[in-house]
C-alpha cells in the first residue's frame, strides 16, 4: 500500500529520483501511464497485470471502454530504475502532466501519483468539498 507525499525534482536528463520509501514498494521496475486529473500513475508490475486483466474484460463494443483503454495504455511505459533509484519520465508523459522540474509523488493505495508541483498545489487549493465527498462515500458503504 502506498501512502504519503514526497516533494522532489527531475534532474537534467528528465530522471526522477524515486523516494526510498516508494522505491521499496514499487520495486526496481514499474509501469507509468497517463492518470486522471492531469497526473501520472505508477503501478508495480504485479498491480499493472491485475489492472490489465480487468480492463481486458471490458466490451470492445462500448465506445467509452475503448476510449479509456486507449487513453490508459497509449501512454504506458516501463520504468527501470538505475542504481541511484532514478527513472526516466518520457517527454510525452512530462508534457501530459505539465511537469517541468519540481514534482510531488503521493501514495494512493495501490498506485503512486506523480504531479507537477504547480498542478498539485492548484488541485489542493481548489474548492473540493470533502464533507460532501465523505457523504457520497458513506452512500457507497465506505
From Swiss-Prot:
InterPro entries for the chain: MraZ, MraZ_C, MraZ_dom, MraZ_N, MraZ_sf, SpoVT-AbrB_dom, SpoVT-AbrB_sf
Gene Ontology MF term list: DNA-binding transcription factor activity; transcription cis-regulatory region binding
One Pfam family cited in the UniProt record for this chain: MraZ
Gene Ontology CC terms: cytoplasm; nucleoid
Residue ranges constituting the SpoVT-AbrB domain according to the UniProt record: 5-47, 76-119
Cell compartments where the protein resides: Cytoplasm, Nucleoid
Record has Cytoplasm as a keyword: yes
Subunit structure: Forms oligomers.
Family: Belongs to the MraZ family.
Protein name as catalogued: Transcriptional regulator MraZ
Organismal lineage: Bacteria, Bacillati, Bacillota, Clostridia, Eubacteriales
